[in-house]
């Protein structure tokens, strides 16, 4: 696999960047010699996978504990085993910091504001560049992403739904990496821990 695709002239662009399928949809080939993978060997998996799923997969493959309070992704081992994973992710997320790009200078955008986000499910792709109107693409009717529905009144509801989904994904990021939820919520006497009152308001 790779961390990005390549336009190769599609959309009159080269290289990577932006959020068209040519850039963000990247094939991944997994060869797992384990016997448990025989069930899915030679098959294609169409469910959403993100680069952040790789590290949890590697840790799971060598039976090392996965620090779920630190890692955003999901292990792919259940998919390789052919397990029924009904609660698998229903969307993928991507973001870009284009502070070093020429586009930032042309648009006269501050370095901290040169950020963009994308969220995609099976039907829709929603893109938001900070400081600009959102973009929306109907991936069923417009798989090549030529018709931006970002200002379409008819699609205002789906735009709002995708915006909420994007916001939820950003809000749900794992920011507290030093302690698990179990550790934080464990009942204890704050007045006795090392004689220091921590977390008491």
Predicted regions and their residues:
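Histidine-centered active-site microenvironments of extracellular/periplasmic hydrolases
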Residues: 1-40, 50
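C-terminal cap/loop subdomain of S1 sulfatases and analogous C-terminal strand-loop tails that border
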Residues: 6-10, 52-55, 60-135, 139, ...
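Conserved beta-strand positions that form and line the central face of beta-propeller blades
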Residues: 7, 18-19, 28, 44, ...
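Active-site rim elements
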Residues: 15, 37-48, 61-67, 115, ...
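Short, solvent-exposed loop/helix junctions and linker helices
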Residues: 23, 45-52, 70, 113, ...
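Generic recognition of well-ordered alpha-helical segments
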Residues: 25, 50-61, 75, 79, ...
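Intrinsically disordered, low-complexity polar regions and short flexible loop motifs
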Residues: 142
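Long, internal low-complexity/basic segments
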Residues: 149-201
């Amino acid at each position: 696999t790779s961390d990005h695709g390549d336009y190769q002239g599609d959309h009159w662009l080269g290289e990577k960047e932006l959020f068209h399928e040519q850039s963000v949809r990247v094939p991944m080939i997994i060869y797992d010699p384990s016997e448990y993978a025989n069930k899915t060997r030679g098959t294609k998996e169409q469910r959403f996978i993100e680069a952040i799923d790789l590290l949890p997969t590697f840790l799971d493959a060598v039976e090392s504990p996965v620090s779920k309070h630190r890692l955003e992704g999901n292990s792919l081992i259940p998919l390789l085993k052919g397990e029924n994973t009904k609660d698998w992710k229903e969307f993928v997320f991507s973001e870009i910091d284009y502070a070093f790009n020429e586009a930032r200078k042309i648009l006269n955008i501050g370095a901290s504001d040169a950020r963009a986000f994308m969220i995609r499910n099976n039907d829709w792709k929603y893109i938001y560049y900070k400081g600009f109107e959102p973009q929306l693409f109907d991936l069923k009717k417009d798989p090549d992403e030529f018709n931006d529905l970002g200002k379409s009144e008819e699609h205002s509801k789906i735009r709002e739904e995708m915006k909420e989904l994007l916001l939820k994904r950003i809000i749900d990021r794992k920011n507290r990496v030093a302690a698990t939820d179990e550790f934080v919520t464990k009942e204890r006497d704050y007045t006795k821990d090392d004689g220091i009152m921590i977390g008491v308001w």
